[in-house]
Each structure stands twice: as structure tokens, then as C-alpha cells.
A protein has these predicted regions:
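Flexible glycine/acidic-rich beta-alpha junction loops that bind and position SAM and/or redox cofactors
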Residues: 10-16, 104-108, 230-231, 289-294, ...
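Structural recognition of alpha->loop->beta junctions
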Residues: 108-128, 270-278, 338-351
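Conserved beta-strand positions
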Residues: 5, 71, 221-223, 281, ...
């Protein structure tokens, strides 16, 4: 069976980083890990090709070659997903769809033309799909019916199908699921609250496969909470450290984790020694009442500012997500987020207005309260250019204006340089470097592509723009007081090349949506009494 995998195009988002990727001559930040995992779960005698539409178009020759088209994507990719399904059907090809969008909203109109809907986790539903194909069936819908697979038998993804040089980072997955119950989160809906992990041997085999394919850059562990199962994470990390030492630390790692990481010094030390250089935290808001409303109680048990500082002291850069628009939220939430980010110095602070995602606790509550203003199948997903999809407890325009103002202030060029400088002056030194001499001696020098990118950033921020004096003062300050993090400091300064452009996108698109709101559109719901858990 000649199988063509297609990964739909993403809209521009906070994480698309186009301007940064242009500097380093790459197309996309991350590959479609889900599709290459599906490829490994299908019969290996099938012929396979993969096209990531974020990298390039599907060629006529590839359409002609295909006997089956497999498409997977997230809610934010649904528009292009529909286009690719239609193109396949125009050519008379059978289409199978799956992934987060199909699993959460299988009856969405964008999926109407698909022949097969392979829902939930593929370890369970792909065998059903394969059986249907082998029986000659022309369509079907396959669901796990709530069952969650044991991922210790999941094979190494087919990384060989990827155009590796197009990507800035690779992706691997160690765990699925999260033990917490944040009301707005769809991860526990898709993967459950009991984190399931691969074995250390499995993950090491995946890294070895990437290494054998020539990969030598960063790797993102896509786990939604890498420390959801701390015991198993601590079993993995010693094996990962040994592998890194034996191979001369070819990879740096980034991942996502809950804030309680900061309370576990042993875990942070182990991650730092494996060369984890960044972690994304869902901080959401500094307002404790809003955290309680959202059932994100793990963020209320200790100081969030201290958590950011403790993680940074291990040489692990904190990235963080923030949300505006919670029920009962008081005016000025945007200001409070900006103040928190400025005090902690978090360089990459992702902001967005709250979205009720299909099937989440938030969705069901708002549906019961009659406050949803969007059908389930019309959900847009989490993006920084979407208004809230429900009636909030304060005016939509007030929330949206606070959001745009806060986002623009966070990435104002002078403020950004000051914040990044503040962060890197207190950043801990990378712990892993002490093990490199015992392995391979000095680390490999940076490539010419990376050097050229940094020179362009220095030209723009240090000479061309009115940030020049602030740039050089900050550079000299970090070089003098914390030289071990100077390279990282420059790389993170470069990120604002993307955020500068994205500020304009956020302002324009949110403004257009506000202008399009009809006069009779409900702008706020009655204040609801905050319920303390």
C-alpha cells in the first residue's frame, strides 16, 4: 500500500518563529511526531512518503504515486486539513484522518469527506483500521472507547521519512497524560490523568536513531508534563545522562512541566546534567483566585516567582504560558501579568485569551451555563489571535484590549532587552558542561549558519535600531557578570525578531475581530461567585 502522509499547514502563531527560522535557514520549528509514530505502527511492508505542508507543497508526482492518504492535525490546522482532504478526494484517493482535531471533534465539517476516521491513540485504533483496509472496506470510524494503551510497546518513530534539515528541532515523547485537572486543559481528555511512560530503553533507542540519521541539534520532549510521573522520569534521566556523555552531548533538550518541578532539587539537577536547557511552565496567571477557579491548584501551593528563580538557578531557562479571561477575573489582569513577567525576567511569555476547548471541563460547564458562543465543531483551538469563544464575566472588549496592550508591552524592544538581561544575570551555569571533557573534549564549534544569524541580530539590534546602546550595555554586563550564559543570552535576544512582527499580527487580527462583533453580541456574563476548591 503506497501511503502518503500529509501534515497540514499551521497559521502563524507565537511558536511559529518564522523570522528566527529564516536567520538559520530552516523552515519549521518542529516535525509531525504523531505522523511518524503512526508510520511506525502501520505494516512496514507498506511504501510510505511524508509531506509536511509547513515545509513544502505536495507534488503532482506524489499525488499520482499514492494509493492511500493519511492526514493528522490539531484544531488550529483544520482549515488546511480540509483542503488536503478535498484534494485527495478530487483524485479519487481514500483518506484516513486522525490526531487531536479528529479525536476531539470527529463530526466537524472539515472532516466530512474523509473515508476513515482513526480516533484516539493509534496503538489501539490503528490495528482496527489496518484490518478494515485488508478486508477491502471503503470506510470506517474507529475509537478506543476510553481505553488507554500501554506505550511501552510503541515502536521507534519513522524519523527517516522526515526532511530533517528543514527542522530546527526534533521531537520525541516519553509520557502521555497528566495527573492534574486544570479545567481548561484538553490533555487529560485526550490522554487521561494517569501518566503512562515509555521505558528508558525505548527513549534511548529513539535518540540513537536520530543520532544515526545525523541529527545533532536540539530535541523537544513533547510530553505535556514531563514530570507527571516523577518516579519514571527519575529512572530515565540517569540513562539519558550516560548516553549523552558517551556521545559527547550531541543534543540539548527542552520540555514542558508543571510548576512543582521547582520543589524537587534532585529532579532539576538530573535534568540539568542531561542538558535540558529550557522548560515550558503553564503559569497562566499570578492571580491566585483565578488559578483556583481554573482548578490549577498546583500553582497556588508556593511562590510562582520563587519557582521561576529556582529552576533558572540550575541553568534551565523558563518559558511560560499566561491566560487572560478567567471567570471572576478583575480588571488589570494584563498589567499584573506584565509585572510578573518583568519581575521574574521570563524571556518567552506566551499570552492568549482563554479558549473553551471541546470536551474539557470548562467546555461542559460553560455549555451548561449557556455561555458558549461557538459550536463544538467550530472551535478554533488555542492561538494568540483568537477572541474568547464564550461569554466572559467581564466585557470581551476590555479583556481583548488588556491582552493586546500586555502582549505589545512584553515585546517592546527596549523592555525585552531589559527583561532578558535581568534573567540571564541571575541564570545558573549549565551543569552538563562539566561532563564534556570526560567524553569528547571541547564541544563542537557553532556552525557558520548560526554565526551568521547572530551577526545579523547584532547588526539589527546593536547598530541599526534605536536599541543599540541598550543592546551593547546589556551584552557587556552579561559578559562581565555571567559569561557562561552569553551565547544563550544572544540567542534569546534574537527571538524578538519574531515577536516584533507578531505584535503587529496580534494587534491587527484582534482589532479586526472586535470590529466585526455585532452590536447585540453579548459582551459579558453576570459575575459568578468564585468557588474555592
Amino acid at each position: 500500500m503506497r501511503t502518503l502522509f500529509i501534515y497540514p499547514e499551521f497559521p502563524k502563531t507565537f511558536w511559529s518563529y518564522e523570522k528566527i527560522l529564516e536567520l538559520v535557514n530552516r523552515k519549521v520549528l518542529l516535525p509531525p511526531l504523531g505522523l511518524v509514530t503512526v508510520a511506525a505502527l502501520l505494516p512496514q511492508h507498506w511504501e510510505m512518503k511524508l509531506v509536511d505542508r509547513n515545509v513544502r507543497e505536495v507534488t503532482a508526482a506524489e499525488w499520482d504515486w499514492a494509493e492511500l492518504v493519511v492526514i493528522s492535525g490539531m484544531i488550529v490546522q483544520k482549515a488546511d486539513m480540509a483542503v488536503q482532504i478535498a484534494r485527495a478526494k478530487e483524485r479519487g484517493l481514500p483518506v484516513a484522518v486522525g490526531g487531536p482535531f479528529a479525536s476531539s471533534t470527529p463530526d466537524a465539517p472539515e472532516l466530512d469527506l474523509a473515508d476513515f476516521k482513526v480516533l484516539d491513540e493509534g496503538e489501539i485504533t490503528l490495528p482496527l483500521f489496518i484490518d478494515a483496509i485488508e478486508r477491502g472496506e471503503a470506510g470506517g470510524r474507529f475509537s478506543a472507547e476510553g481505553e488507554k494503551p500501554d506505550v511501552t510497546s510503541t515502536p521507534v518513530p519513522r524519523f527517516d521519512l522526515l526532511e530533517l534539515e528543514a527542522y530546527d528541532s526534533m521531537s520525541v515523547q516519553f509520557s502521555r497524560g497528566c495527573p492534574f485537572q486544570c479545567e481548561f486543559c484538553d490533555i487529560i481528555v485526550l490522554y487521561g490523568r494517569k501518566p503512562r511512560t515509555k521505558t528508558p530503553e525505548q527513549l534511548i533507542a529513539e535518540l540513537q536513531r536520530l543520532y544515526d540519521l545525523g541529527w545533532r541539534r536540539s530535541i523537544f520532549l513533547v510530553d505535556d508534563n514531563f514530570i507527571g510521573n516523577k518516579r519514571n522520569a527519575k529512572l530515565l534521566l540517569p540513562a539519558l545522562k550516560t548516553w549523552q556523555i558517551e556521545h559527547g552531548y550531541p543534543f540539548s533538550f527542552a520540555t514542558e512541566a508543571s510548576v512543582d518541578l521547582a520543589a524537587d532539587d534532585e529532579l532539576m539537577e538530573m535534568m540539568a546534567e542531561c542538558r535540558f536547557d529550557s522548560v515550558f511552565l503553564g503559569i497562566e496567571t499570578p492571580d491566585a483566585a483565578s488559578l483556583e477557579t481554573a482548578k490549577k491548584l498546583q500553582n497556588t501551593r508556593s511562590s510562582l516567582e520563587e519557582a521561576v528563580d529556582r529552576i533558572g538557578s540550575y541553568g534551565i531557562r523558563v518559558m511560560a504560558g499566561f491566560i487572560i479571561g478567567f471567570d471572576g477575573e478583575k480588571s488589570g489582569a494584563g498589567d499584573r501579568i506584565v509585572e510578573f513577567v518583568s519581575r521574574t525576567g521570563i524571556p518567552a511569555a506566551m499570552m492568549g485569551m482563554l479558549q473553551a476547548l471541546p470536551n474539557t471541563g470548562l467546555w461542559h460547564r460553560l455549555e451548561k451555563e449557556g455561555r458558549l458562543i461557538q459550536e463544538k465543531d467550530a472551535a478554533k483551538g488555542v492561538n494568540q489571535t483568537n477572541l474568547l469563544n464564550f461569554v466572559p464575566t467581564r466585557p470581551i472588549r476590555e479583556i481583548a484590549n488588556e491582552y493586546v496592550d500586555a502582549f505589545c508591552r512584553l515585546y517592546e524592544p527596549h523592555a525585552y532587552i531589559d527583561r532578558v538581561t535581568h534573567y540571564y544575570l541571575k541564570m545558573g551555569l549549565p551543569r552538563w558542561q562539566q561532563y564534556v571533557p570526560a567524553a569528547f573534549g571541547k564541544a563542537a564549534p557553532p556552525s557558520w549558519t548560526d554565526v551568521r544569524a547572530l551577526l545579523i541580530v547584532i547588526w539589527r539590534q546593536g547598530l541599526q535600531r534605536d536599541t543599540r546602546w541598550r543592546f551593547w550595555r546589556s551584552l557587556l554586563k552579561v559578559a562581565r557578570h555571567n559569561p557562561g550564559v552569553l551565547e544563550q543570552f544572544l540567542v534569546v535576544l534574537a527571538h524578538n525578531e519574531h515577536f516584533l512582527e507578531y505584535r503587529g499580527i496580534v494587534t491587527r487580527e484582534i482589532g479586526d475581530q472586535l470590529a466585526a462583533l455585532p452590536a447585540e453580541e453579548p459582551v459579558s456574563a453576570p459575575q459568578r461567585e468564585l468557588q474555592r476548591a
